[in-house]
Amino acid sequence: MELFFDALLDALIDGVKMLPFLYLAYLLIEWLERHHGESIEEALAGGGRWGFIPGALLGCVPQCGFSAVASNLYASRVITPGTVLAVFIATSDEAIPLLAAEPSLWVTLVLLLACKVAFAIVGGWLLDIPLRHILPHSLYGGYEGHADEVDCHEEHEETSSIFLAALRHTLEIFVFILLFSFIIGLVFEAFGEEPIAAALSGMGVFQPMLTALVGLVPNCAVSVLLAQLYVQGAITFGSLFAGLTAGAGVGLAVLWRVNPSWKQNLFMTGLLWAVGAAAGMLLQILPL
C-alpha cells in the first residue's frame, strides 16, 4: 500500500509541476485558433513543408510540454509528420538542467544538443521530402498544403472564454499524463533503478536499442533517469543519445490521445524508436 501511495504522490508532484506550462500552451493555442487561424494557414501554405527546421530548434527548449503542443498541431493537420518528428527527436526536457548542473559535462551537453538538432533536421527532411512520395497517406497524415482547421483539440468552443477552454483541455491532458506517470512510477518503485542500470550495463553495442525503448515511455522522469545513468557511467553517450532521441516527454502520450489514426501513431512511435536506436548505435563508435 505504501508503494502505491508513493507512486501516486510522485505522479501528482510531477504532473502539478507541468500544469502551468501546459495551461499557458493551451491558452496560446486557443488564442491562435480564434484570432490568427487564417494567417497561420497562409504561413503554412507558403512553407509548411520546411517546418522541421524550426521544430528541431524549438524542441531543444528544456521542457516536455512543447512536444505535447506539437502532437496537438499534428493531429489537427497544422504541421507535417517531419515537423512533429523533429520536435520529438530534439526534445530532451529535464535531462538538460541535470547535465548542465555538472560543469564537467558542459561539452557533452553542447554536443548532445548539436547532434539532436542535426538528426532532427535530417529525420524531418527525409520524412517530409523524399519519403512523402513513398509512404501511403494512411501512415503519413499531418499537414497537406492547407490547414482545414487550426484546432488542437477534439472540440472547440467559440463562445466560451479562452481561459476556461484552455483550462478544460489542460485538465483533460493532465488526467491522461497522470495515469501514465503513476504506472511508470509504480514500476520504478517496485523494481528500483539499480536493476534497470544493471540490465543496461550488460547490453554492450546493443545498449542503445534498449535505452531507446526506455525513452519511449511518455514521462519526463525517464530523461532524468537516463541522464543519471550516464553521469554514473552505467550507459554510454550513444545510449544516452538514443534514449533522449526516442524520448519525447509526454508528446507520445498526447499523440495517442488526440490523433484518431492508430496507424499514424504506431508508425511515428516505431520511427522514433528506430531513429533513436540507429543514431545511438552509430555514436557508439565514437569515444564519447
Predicted features along the sequence, with ranges:
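A cytosolic-side transmembrane-helix exit/cap motif
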Residues: 132-137, 217-221, 260-262, 288
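Membrane-interfacial helix-loop connectors
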Residues: 58-113, 188-259
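Membrane-interface amphipathic/juxtamembrane segments adjacent to transmembrane helices
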Residues: 40-48, 142
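Cytoplasmic-side transmembrane-helix entry/capping segments in multi-pass membrane proteins
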Residues: 45-46, 83-88, 266-271
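Selected transmembrane alpha-helices and immediately adjacent juxtamembrane segments
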Residues: 1-31, 38, 111-208, 269-288
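Interfacial loop-to-transmembrane junctions
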Residues: 36, 256-274
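Hydrophobic transmembrane alpha-helices
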Residues: 45-47, 53-63
